[in-house]
C-alpha cells in the first residue's frame, strides 16, 4: 500500500504515549498518524473504524436521552416552552406529542418515554462500539465481506452510498407516517390558535413542491424557507423520501459512470470532505429555517421569529392607542408616513414605523386581519380578538435577541424578561457549526486532492530549524 504521508523521523520523538499506545497496526510508524489524530489511524482498519463510529453514535444518542430527561425534569407547564431554555422538547411538541389546543403542554409522559428510549438505545450502541473497538476483528473484509470495503472500490462505495440514501428516505417517511396515521403533528395554523391534527390533503404536485426550489431566496419569496403550510411540508417529505429511496436503489444496482470515475477523488478522505460539505449546506439551510419559518418551527414552542416579534410590537401599540381614541388609519408618524399603518410601494397596507421592513411576515395571529390588499382597516377596527392581543403582547416581549449571559430581549425594552430564545440558540449554533463543517470540507478536500495528485507529503522537514539544534538527549 502506498503511504501518502512522510514517516521519516530525524530524532526520536518521546511522548508519554509512545510505548503504551503502540497497538497492533495503529501506531504512528504503521499508519503515519500519531495517537492524537484519532480515527485517521483507523482509515484502513474497517473493523476498528466501525467501533469508533458506533461508539460515537452511542455518545450522540446518550446526549439526546440525558438532555431530554434533564429538560423534562426542569419543565414547568405553566410557562411558555420558549421561556425555559429548552431545545429538545420543542421538537417533540412540534411532532404532536403531549400537546393540546393553542400549543399548551398537557402531558409530559411522552417526553419521558423518548428520553428513556434514547438512553436504552445508547447503551446498546455503547456496548457495540466498545466491542468493535477492543474485541471485534480489525478488518471486516475477510470475515464479513458484505460489511467490508476498500476505499478505492468505486462500486462498493456507491453501494454504501445507496444504503445510506435508503435509510435517509425511510427517515423522511417516518415523519410522513406520523403526520398521516400516528396522531398527526402540531399545526400552528389550525383555527383558534394552533392544534394537533392529522394531515389529510397532501400536496404532491411537483409544480408546487419543486416550485419552492425555483423561488428567489430574498424577501417576499424566501426559497424553500417560505413554506407556510403542513400539507406542503409533508408532501415535500413524500417526494424527498421517494427520491432518496429510488436514488439509493439506483446506486446499489449500478456502477459509477466513466465521467464520475474520472471527475471524483475516490479515497476515504475525499468521502469525508464530500460529507462535511453536504452537512455544512444543511446547517446553513437549517439556520435560515429555524430563524424565519414559524410553520416548521411553531412560535408557540420556539418563541416568535424576529420579524414576528417586531410586527407584534406594532400590532400591540396599534391596539392600545386605538382603544385610547387614536385614528390608526390616518395618524402620521415622525417621518410623514403612517404611524400605525401605511401603504407599501406596491399598494398593500402594512404596519408602519420601523417594522415596515418585515412587511412580508405571515403569522397565525395576524393573518385573520388581512384583506385582499394587505391589512384590512375595518378588521383592525372591529375584528381583533383577545387571543390575538394576548399572543402579540407575549411575542413582543420575547424577541429572539439576547447574549450568552441570558440578558435577553431588546436591550432598551423595559418590559423584556431575562430570556434567550431557542430560535437564537438553534439558528446561531447551526450557522456556526455549519461554518466549521465548511472549513473542514475545504481542509479535507484539499488534502484528498493533493494526495490523489501525488504531492501530499506533509510539511517539508528538510529545512526545519530543529534539525540544526542539539538533540535534547
Swiss-Prot record:
Provide the cofactor note recorded for this chain's UniProt entry.
Answer: Binds multiple chlorophylls and provides some of the ligands for the Ca-4Mn-5O cluster of the oxygen-evolving complex. It may also provide a ligand for a Cl- that is required for oxygen evolution. PSII binds additional chlorophylls, carotenoids and specific lipids.
Task: PTM N-acetylthreonine: list the residues.
Answer: 15
What GO molecular function annotation could you give as one example from this UniProt entry?
electron transporter, transferring electrons within the cyclic electron transport pathway of photosynthesis activity
**GO-annotated biological processes:** photosynthetic electron transport in photosystem II
Q: Name one GO cellular component term.
A: chloroplast thylakoid membrane
Q: Give the record's membrane topology.
A: Multi-pass membrane protein
Q: Which domain of life, per UniProt?
A: Eukaryota
The cross-references to SUPFAM superfamilies, in alphabetical order and at most eight, read:
Photosystem II antenna protein-like
Cellular compartment(s): Plastid, Chloroplast thylakoid membrane
Which residue spans traverse the membrane? 69-93, 134-155, 178-200, 255-275, 291-312, 447-471
Q: What is its main location?
A: plastid
Return the HAMAP family for the record: PSII_PsbC_CP43
**What does the protein in this record do?**
One of the components of the core complex of photosystem II (PSII). It binds chlorophyll and helps catalyze the primary light-induced photochemical processes of PSII. PSII is a light-driven water:plastoquinone oxidoreductase, using light energy to abstract electrons from H(2)O, generating O(2) and a proton gradient subsequently used for ATP formation.
Give the protein family: Belongs to the PsbB/PsbC family. PsbC subfamily.
What is the name attached to this protein's record? Photosystem II CP43 reaction center protein
Which organism is this protein's natural source?
Marchantia polymorpha
Amino acid at each position: 500500500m502506498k503511504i501518502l504521508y512522510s514517516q521519516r523521523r530525524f530524532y526520536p520523538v518521546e511522548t508519554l504515549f509512545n510505548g503504551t499506545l503502540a497497538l497492533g497496526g495503529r501506531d504512528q510508524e504503521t499508519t503515519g498518524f500519531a495517537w492524537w489524530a484519532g480515527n485517521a489511524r483507523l482509515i484502513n482498519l474497517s473493523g476498528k473504524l466501525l467501533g469508533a463510529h458506533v461508539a460515537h453514535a452511542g455518545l450522540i444518542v446518550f446526549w439526546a436521552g440525558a438532555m431530554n430527561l434533564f429538560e423534562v425534569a426542569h419543565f414547568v407547564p405553566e410557562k411558555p416552552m420558549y421561556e425555559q431554555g429548552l431545545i429538545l422538547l420543542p421538537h417533540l411538541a412540534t411532532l404532536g406529542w403531549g400537546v393540546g389546543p393553542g400549543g399548551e403542554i398537557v402531558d409530559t409522559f411522552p417526553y419521558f418515554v423518548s428520553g428513556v428510549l434514547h438512553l436504552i438505545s445508547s447503551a446498546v450502541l455503547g456496548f457495540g462500539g466498545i466491542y468493535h473497538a477492543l474485541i471485534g476483528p480489525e478488518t471486516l473484509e475477510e470475515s464479513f465481506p458484505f460489511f467490508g470495503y476498500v476505499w478505492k472500490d468505486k462500486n462498493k462505495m456507491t453501494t454504501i452510498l445507496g444504503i445510506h440514501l435508503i435509510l435517509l428516505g425511510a427517515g423522511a417517511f417516518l415523519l410522513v407516517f406520523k403526520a398521516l396515521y400516528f396522531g398527526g403533528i402540531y399545526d400552528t395554523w389550525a383555527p383558534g390558535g394552533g392544534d394537533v391534527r392529522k394531515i389529510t390533503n397532501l400536496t404532491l404536485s411537483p409544480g408546487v413542491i419543486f416550485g419552492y426550489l425555483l423561488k428567489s431566496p430574498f424577501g417576499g419569496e424566501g426559497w424553500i424557507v417560505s413554506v407556510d403550510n403542513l400539507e406542503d411540508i409533508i408532501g415535500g417529505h413524500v417526494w424527498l423520501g421517494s427520491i432518496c429511496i429510488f436514488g439509493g436503489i439506483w446506486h446499489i444496482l449500478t456502477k459509477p459512470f466513466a465521467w464520475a470515475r474520472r471527475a471524483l477523488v475516490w479515497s476515504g478522505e475525499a468521502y469525508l470532505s464530500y460529507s462535511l460539505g453536504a452537512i455544512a449546506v444543511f446547517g446553513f439551510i437549517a439556520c435560515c429555517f429555524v430563524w424565519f419559518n414559524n410553520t416548521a418551527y411553531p412560535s408557540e414552542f420556539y418563541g416568535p421569529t424576529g420579524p414576528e416579534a417586531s410586527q407584534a410590537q406594532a400590532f400591540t401599540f396599534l391596539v392600545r392607542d386605538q382603544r385610547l381614541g387614536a385614528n390608526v388609519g390616518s395618524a402620521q408618524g415622525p417621518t410623514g408616513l403612517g404611524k400605525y399603518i401605511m401603504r407599501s410601494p406596491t399598494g398593500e397596507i402594512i404596519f408602519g414605523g420601523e417594522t415596515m421592513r418585515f412587511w412580508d411576515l405571515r403569522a397565525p395571529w395576524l393573518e385573520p386581519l388581512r384583506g385582499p390588499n394587505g391589512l384590512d382597516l375595518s378588521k383592525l377596527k372591529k375584528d381583533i380578538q383577545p387571543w390575538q392581543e394576548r399572543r402579540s403582547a407575549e411575542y413582543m416581549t420575547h424577541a429572539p435577541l439576547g447574549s450568552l449571559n441570558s440578558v435577553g430581549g431588546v436591550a432598551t425594552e423595559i418590559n423584556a424578561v431575562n430570556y434567550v430564545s431557542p430560535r437564537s440558540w438553534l439558528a446561531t449554533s447551526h450557522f456556526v457549526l455549519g461554518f466549521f463543517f465548511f472549513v473542514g470540507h475545504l481542509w479535507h478536500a484539499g488534502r484528498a486532492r493533493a494526495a490523489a495528485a501525488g504531492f501530499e507529503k506533509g510539511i517539508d522537514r528538510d529545512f526545519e530549524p530543529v534539525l540544526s539544534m542539539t538533540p535534547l538527549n
